Structures are given as structure tokens and as C-alpha cells.
From Swiss-Prot:
Function according to Swiss-Prot or TrEMBL: Facilitates DNA repair, cell cycle progression, and cell proliferation through its interaction with CIAO2B.
Omega-N-methylarginine: residues bearing it: 47
Bias kind Low complexity: ranges: 26-37
Keyword set, alphabetical order: Coiled coil, Cytoplasm, Cytoskeleton, Methylation, Nucleus, Phosphoprotein
Protein name: Coiled-coil domain-containing protein 117
Main location, first listed in the record: cytoplasm
PANTHER family in alphabetical order: COILED-COIL DOMAIN-CONTAINING PROTEIN 117
Organism, scientific name: Mus musculus
Encoding gene, per UniProt annotation: Ccdc117
């Protein structure tokens, strides 16, 4: 670059001594007078300059963390002592219950497990299952007890109604001796017992009626033999046949009486025609 005759803009052309001096390692800090070279050397680690953005973010994080810590301490100080004791007691009771449940589970299953190996979801599932079992059993018992009470109440009401009911209000069936003997002779005794038992209900009624012998005779009249039936039928057919020729003869007799009159009229007409000719 110098051979071409053009000055390099990155380097100062003046030969001042400031350019050759190294920049200070820690700007704005005064080192103690008796500090050695190894004390002045920078320590290992990444350190950002005050003007760099990395240094600014690091300082911002530290300040935010300090603020949060101070805020928590202030809130703890402002919290009343009674509230602190209550929260500590609740947390202690919860941890004791978890430890006791884990110990009982190890004794019941016979497996030596570390408390730290027990996960929170598994413990919660076990607790929920135990609660469901304890709440489900009483519900079944309560439902069974209610059903039993309802059944007992219904039975008691039926017994009271039957005891209060008077026997005279029920329908009665009076059977005569002849009817009893007839039923025993024709039917089985079990059937009669069932009939009588069915009459104990108020909605059942039985009416027995026997028609008079004049209306319905016991024995039908003997029918005529087939030969007599044929003779009667032939006689019935012959009677209309004899009556029919008599009627035909009566109709033909007037026609025969009118024949000579017709003949006389014809003779008279013929004589008149001859006279005209």
C-alpha cells in the first residue's frame, strides 16, 4: 500500500508514542502501588467490558435476581407468625401422611422400596382408589337398606289391609249338596278347589244357570227313517203334478168353446164377398 503512494487509513501517519503504548487492561481502576505482574494479570473467565452488551445483560440479571430475593424476604417478614405456623403444620401433616402410606405399602407388599422412588402420580392414584372403595361400600349398604325398608313397609300395609277387611264384603259361593256331588262326579276335586279359591277375590263372580226342560229337552225326538222320507218326498212331488193338468184342461176348455163362433164369422164374411161379386 505504501509502495503505491497511498496512505493507509487504519494506521496513524504521525509517529507519536501513544500509538505504540498498550491500552490499559482495566480502564478507570487504580491498582494498588505494590501489586506485582501476576496480580495484575486478568483472571480466567469470560468478562464483558462495561461498554459491551454482554456485560450490561449480566449486570441486569444479577440486579433482577437480587430484587426478587429482597422482595421475597420482605414478604416473609411481613407475613404474620400465625399464618407461618399454619402453613408449616399443613405441610408437615401432608409429608407425614405420604411417608406413612409409603411405609404401609412396603409392609403390605413385602418389597423394600426407597421413598424417593415413589412417584407422586402413583401415590395419588392409590389414595383415590382407597377413597372410591370407602365411599362405594357405604353407598351400596345404604341402597340395600332402603330397599329392605320399602319391602317391609309394603308387606306391613298389605297385612293391615287384609286384617281390616271384613269377610262379609267378599263374594260368597253357596253350593247345594246335589251340585257338590255332581261336580265331584264329573270333575276332579282339585278343579273345584281352584274355583273356590278364585272366588276369594272381590273381582270374580260365578253364575251357574240351568235351563228348564221345556226350553231345552234333555233327549231329542227320534228322526224318521230314510225310507219314509223318500215316500213323503215322492208324494209331495206327485201332488203338484196332478194339480197342473187340471189347470191346463180348464184353460183349454174356453178355447174350444170359442171355435164355433170363429167359424160362423168366417162363413158370414165369405157370403158378403160373393154378393158383391
Amino acid at each position: 500500500m505504501a509502495a503505491l503512494g497511498r496512505p493507509f487509513s487504519g494506521l496513524p501517519l504521525s509517529g507519536s508514542a501513544d500509538f505504540l503504548q498498550p491500552p490499559p487492561a482495566f480502564a478507570g481502576r487504580a491498582f494498588p502501588p505494590g501489586a506485582a505482574g501476576h496480580d495484575l494479570a486478568p483472571r480466567p473467565g469470560v468478562r464483558g467490558a462495561p461498554s459491551s452488551p454482554g456485560g450490561r445483560t449480566a449486570r441486569g440479571r444479577v440486579s433482577i435476581h437480587c430484587r426478587k430475593k429482597h422482595k421475597r424476604l420482605a414478604e416473609d417478614d411481613e407475613c404474620p407468625v400465625r399464618k407461618k405456623r399454619l402453613t408449616e403444620a399443613e405441610l408437615g401433616a401432608v409429608t407425614d401422611e405420604w411417608a406413612l402410606g409409603a411405609h404401609q405399602g412396603r409392609e403390605g407388599h413385602g418389597v423394600n422400596t426407597c421413598p424417593s422412588s415413589l412417584s407422586m402420580p402413583s401415590m395419588l392414584d392409590v389414595v383415590c382408589e382407597e377413597m372410591d372403595q370407602t365411599t362405594g361400600e357405604p353407598q351400596c349398604e345404604v341402597a340395600r337398606r332402603r330397599l329392605q325398608e320399602i319391602e317391609d313397609r309394603i308387606i306391613d300395609e298389605d297385612e293391615e289391609v287384609e286384617s281390616d277387611r271384613n269377610v262379609s264384603h267378599l263374594p260368597s259361593l253357596v253350593l247345594s249338596d246335589t251340585m257338590k256331588t255332581g261336580l265331584k262326579r264329573e270333575f276332579d276335586e282339585v278343579f273345584t278347589k281352584r274355583m273356590i279359591e278364585s272366588m276369594s277375590r272381590p273381582s270374580m263372580e260365578l253364575v251357574l244357570w240351568k235351563p228348564l226342560p221345556e226350553l231345552l229337552p234333555e233327549k231329542p225326538k227320534p228322526s224318521s227313517s230314510p225310507k219314509n222320507y223318500r215316500r213323503e218326498s215322492q208324494a209331495k212331488h206327485a201332488a203338484p203334478g196332478t194339480a197342473f193338468p187340471q189347470r191346463t184342461e180348464g184353460l183349454l176348455e174356453p178355447q174350444c168353446a170359442d171355435a164355433p163362433l170363429y167359424r160362423s164369422l168366417e162363413a158370414a164374411t165369405s157370403t158378403e164377398e160373393e154378393m158383391e161379386l
